[in-house]
Amino acid sequence: MKERWLPVGLLAVVLFVVNVAGRIAAKLWADGNDDKETRIGLIALAVIGIVVFATTVYWVRRRPVPRVLTDLAFGVGTACLASVLIGPFLVGDEPFAEGAGLFFRQIWWYLGISIVAAGLGMGIVMTLGKDWKSQAWKRYAEQATAKPRKVARR
């Protein structure tokens, strides 16, 4: 159980920390300046996308795709909910302070960036033939075409 869910929880924590760091940076350095707040928010989203991309590439090489998709869904979903519901409280705001529109827009951006990053990561690894299933088929093909071992006679 620990081996399965520890990496998923770690992914959720890392994504949440990146989001909170972006919120704190926006609060400290861009309080009141919309352009700077937007720029810092986009940088935080880009870092989230990079983390999801790297995690997807790492996991797809070692695990079956359905398991990777499930783990990513739980990790990213948990991080998204924590970032949207808990993150604002850590910088002195409230989740619905600027209305429901911004609240749901944050969710869609977060999930959209994560889905695109995961899709790109999976697509690249599968195209290169480095995913778990391609490697299994490669081993099978090598084993099936190999000459049988000769039995040593005594």
PLM feature spans:
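N-terminal signal-anchor transmembrane alpha-helix
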Residues: 1-48
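Cytoplasmic membrane-interface segments at the C-terminal ends of transmembrane helices
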Residues: 2-5, 52-72, 119-144
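Hydrophobic faces of alpha-helical transmembrane segments in multi-pass integral membrane proteins
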Residues: 10-18, 44-48, 73-78, 82, ...
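Alpha-helical membrane-inserting segments
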Residues: 18-26, 52-56, 81-90, 120-128
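Membrane-interfacial segments
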Residues: 25-34, 60-64, 89-94, 98, ...
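C-terminal halves and exits of single transmembrane alpha-helices
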Residues: 74-98
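Alpha-helical membrane-associated segments of multi-pass integral membrane proteins
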Residues: 92-139
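Cytosolic juxtamembrane regulatory segments of multi-pass membrane proteins
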Residues: 141-154
